[in-house]
């Protein structure tokens, strides 16, 4: 790595772990490090797991998984095994291990597929299924238009009502329901969005949280009522509410602002922090800036 870039990576890493900096700015530093990649960026991200913000640590694990770099495996294993970490953080570490997809982690994932925390257990079960599917389908084309590494490949089915039926069938294996979920996302359009939004009413917390995530990716205004309703359900798992808040920020329709602003003082830290970050994303989506994680030209100026 060139000396100047290495210096900027170091500066971004320092910003990332500085609890005195605004959380949206730290998020921008994180996503810039993810985009830069490499061992030094991974090391910088890995140092953030001592933070007090579960939301930030969750995003650290997410980014490490999206980077698909084996050098992130040690820190992700450690986070998954650390029962002092919040369930949503451990879950994301397990999902990231599945995203990297190295069969080396199968034994560990099978062990934690029996974890007493249901969100962690289900995540590890999905990760095992994903890696095993990849082993059986090594040449399967990547048809994901969103460029994300997903916890399950999309189903081959293209009929929205059929996919909706699978998605909402709680007797169906979770991996198959996830495959229907990502197929609906890839198909897109209002019918698919509304089918997915129906999933916010059923299933476990992990399932509903993933629904929120994919609706955020789709950025369709038809998802706003369902996401807003989930955010407003105080009895809902904070893991779900936070994902719905981030999705509303990604959609960036004017109707999203009201819901987000109503919860910037929420009693759940992860929810109010998600609303803070989501409002920053909303500003970006409406600003015309080229890239949200524009750290090298803007973020470093604020360090």
Swiss-Prot record:
Cofactor requirements of the protein: Fe(2+)
Pathway: Protein modification; eIF5A hypusination
Positions of HEAT-like PBS-type repeats: 56-82, 89-115, 176-202, 207-233, 240-266
InterPro entries in alphabetical order: ARM-like (IPR011989), ARM-type_fold (IPR016024), Deoxyhypusine_hydroxylase (IPR027517), HEAT_type_2 (IPR021133), PBS_lyase_HEAT (IPR004155)
Disordered as annotated region, ranges: 139-158
Entry EC number(s): 1.14.99.29
A Pfam family reported for this protein in Swiss-Prot or TrEMBL: HEAT_PBS
Cofactor note: Binds 2 Fe(2+) ions per subunit.
Keyword set, alphabetical order: Hypusine biosynthesis, Iron, Metal-binding, Monooxygenase, Oxidoreductase, Repeat
Sites where the protein binds Fe cation 1: 58, 242-243
Highest taxon above the source species: Eukaryota
SUPFAM superfamilies for the chain: ARM repeat
GO BP: any one term: peptidyl-lysine modification to peptidyl-hypusine
Keyword Iron in annotation: yes
A GO molecular-function descriptor: deoxyhypusine monooxygenase activity
Name of the top EC class for this enzyme: oxidoreductase
Chain positions recorded as Fe cation 2 binding sites: 91-92, 209
Catalyzed reaction equations: [eIF5A protein]-deoxyhypusine + AH2 + O2 = [eIF5A protein]-hypusine + A + H2O
Function: Catalyzes the hydroxylation of the N(6)-(4-aminobutyl)-L-lysine intermediate produced by deoxyhypusine synthase/DHPS on a critical lysine of the eukaryotic translation initiation factor 5A/eIF-5A. This is the second step of the post-translational modification of that lysine into an unusual amino acid residue named hypusine. Hypusination is unique to mature eIF-5A factor and is essential for its function.
Family: Belongs to the deoxyhypusine hydroxylase family.
HAMAP family xrefs: Deoxyhypusine_hydroxylase
Protein name: Deoxyhypusine hydroxylase
Native source species: Xenopus laevis (African clawed frog)
Lineage: Eukaryota, Metazoa, Chordata, Craniata, Vertebrata
